[in-house]
Amino acid sequence: LIGQNPGLLIDNCASGGRRLDIEMMKRSVPLWRSDYYVSGNVTDSDSARSIGYNLSYWLPLSCGGSTTDGLGTSYDFRCAMGSGMTVDIPVSDFGWWSRRVDEYFRIRELMSGDYYILSQGNVTNYTKKNACYEYIDPESGEGCLILFRPEGSLAEKQTFYLKGLDPDAVYTLRVSDNGEEITASGKALSDDGLTVSMNQPRMSLVIFFSEK
């Protein structure tokens, strides 16, 4: 098909994502990576997050599904994020939705850079353990952390060790949710880590960082 139609785009939408294999990925784009989508159900949100979180190691470009009802919190919205995302924005509370979409577009620019999973045990225990992953543009030094405390996690505070930083550079980190800013060296963020507090279950944070 591609040989006869140069530039043809083929959507890999078979078996709920079970055909995301190397040969198919050479020839197609996964516009629907799984039949799990963010619908407002707690399990669906965390499952969709885990799929994107782990799949991004091997397949950075993919898209998942969501419903308007399912994206009503920052936690659920961020569970649905990927390099592609479906969003049906309601008229009500347009300002909140606009902020979420603006934040997403900023994160998406970083998704083609380097990707690191900074938390452990999130393949099988993704509903009970905090999650943190990092995107960073190695050329500009700009990046972000996306953090989740799922319903079943008892950990209000956790330290994460950033990767891909210049140890001699100083970084400004800004929490997207409340505007809080700190500065720290790349060496300190990598060696000593960044301690983050999430004081309630089903809480999520996005932290952007850049070299000063």
Residue ranges and their predicted role:
Residues 184-212:
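C-terminal beta-strand-rich structural cap/linker in extracellular carbohydrate-active enzymes
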Residues 1-182, 198, 205:
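Active-site-proximal substrate-binding groove within the catalytic cores of carbohydrate-active enzymes
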